[in-house]
Amino acid sequence: MTFELLATDGKARRGRLTFPRGVVETPAFMPVGTYGTVKGMLPRDIEAIGAQIILGNTFHLWLRPGTEVIRRHGDLHDFMQWHGPILTDSGGFQVFSLGALRKIREEGVYFASPVDGAKVFMGPEESMRVQRDLGSDVVMIFDECTPYPADEEVARRSMELSLRWAGRSKIAHEGNPAALFGIVQGGMHEDLRLRSLDGLEEIGFDGLAIGGLSVGEPKEEMIRVLDFLPPRLPADKPRYLMGVGKPEDLVEGVRRGIDMFDCVMPTRNARNGHLFVDSGVLKIRNAVHRHDESPLDPACDCHTCKHFSRAYLHHLDKCGEMLGSMLNTIHNLRHYQRLMTGLREAIQQGKLAAFVDTFYARRGLPVPPLT
């Protein structure tokens, strides 16, 4: 993987990631394909909405169907028939989400499989092996996601454990041509975030992610970390904000120098009838749309908006038809990709401030301050 920084506008960055399997223009949003599928989307649909890279879930694919099944097809790209780049998370966040079902030790994490209840172990070496078997283009280190809230002592112990696991991940990754990203932890504590960053830079990674956000903290806390941390990340490496978020969060992340994002929100919200439009959120199951012949968003060029009315999408939602979720997902993911395209063009032209002003004006919201 190579990363080129092509333009800046304030803290915002316009870049390009180049992989053997394709080019990713940044800032970029990665649709989430947890089980080897972006829910409701054929691979050709993912390509059609403009996605250049997707995210796969190491933890879930390891448990089911298992890497031995996937490897018989070649790798995850062959298994799911997506031939662009894939970033795989390490499984650390999913283990974190198990709560009382897992026990964290120095060697790794012991837990009961959510698939069949079997006792399972995953550590840095296992995570790196699974991601190698998946043929990931970007591999994430195995880490512990610091919970929120966490006092300084809890956050410190978690961060230091993640640093030790980062070193083991780097060693276990040797010989794998894929890019390896470190993950900055430390909770909401700036001094711990800096210590994590220093430790990761000493180990050496191809890119750095910000973890431990979007885990229940107030929006103000997330923004505080994003005001503080990205300017301190190395300028010559991609910066990835994990698990975030709403369109507004993407805009605020880009304004602060983030290059890569992922989140289940556009696909999950699509299945619940919450659709993103330039003016905000449209709830398609509301009765007001029953006779509405207009498209979801006249400004959108997705297949859904070009061919179907709000009334039809409302009807599908009320009937529980799977086509409704599919069309909604196409629209939401295209909305996110259109947003990223607009951000890239604005940075390239030195017009990000005007883009941000228009973005918030359409939503009837004030522009948040940028420190």
Swiss-Prot record:
Amino acids binding Zn(2+): 300, 302, 305, 331
UniProt KW keywords: Glycosyltransferase, Metal-binding, Queuosine biosynthesis, Transferase, tRNA processing, Zinc
Bound cofactor: record note: Binds 1 zinc ion per subunit.
Gene3D superfamilies listed in its UniProt record: Queuine tRNA-ribosyltransferase-like
Residue positions of the active site: 89 (proton acceptor), 262 (nucleophile)
MF terms (GO), sorted A to Z: metal ion binding; tRNA-guanosine(34) queuine transglycosylase activity
Recorded catalytic activity of this chain's protein: 7-aminomethyl-7-carbaguanine + guanosine(34) in tRNA = 7-aminomethyl-7-carbaguanosine(34) in tRNA + guanine
Membrane spanning stretches: none
CC cofactor: Zn(2+)
One Pfam family from the record: TGT
GO BP term, example: queuosine biosynthetic process
Residues that bind substrate: 89-93, 143, 185, 212
EC number(s) given by UniProt: 2.4.2.29
Record keyword Oxidoreductase present: no
A GO CC term attached to the entry: cytosol
Pathway membership: tRNA modification; tRNA-queuosine biosynthesis
Key word S-adenosyl-L-methionine present: no
Coiled coil regions in record: none
EC main group: transferase
Function: Catalyzes the base-exchange of a guanine (G) residue with the queuine precursor 7-aminomethyl-7-deazaguanine (PreQ1) at position 34 (anticodon wobble position) in tRNAs with GU(N) anticodons (tRNA-Asp, -Asn, -His and -Tyr). Catalysis occurs through a double-displacement mechanism. The nucleophile active site attacks the C1' of nucleotide 34 to detach the guanine base from the RNA, forming a covalent enzyme-RNA intermediate. The proton acceptor active site deprotonates the incoming PreQ1, allowing a nucleophilic attack on the C1' of the ribose to form the product.
Subunit structure: Homodimer. Within each dimer, one monomer is responsible for RNA recognition and catalysis, while the other monomer binds to the replacement base PreQ1.
NCBIfam families associated with the record: Q_tRNA_tgt, tgt_general
HAMAP family: Q_tRNA_Tgt
Protein family according to the UniProt entry: Belongs to the queuine tRNA-ribosyltransferase family.
UniProt-recorded name of the protein: Queuine tRNA-ribosyltransferase
Organism per entry: Azotobacter vinelandii (strain DJ / ATCC BAA-1303)
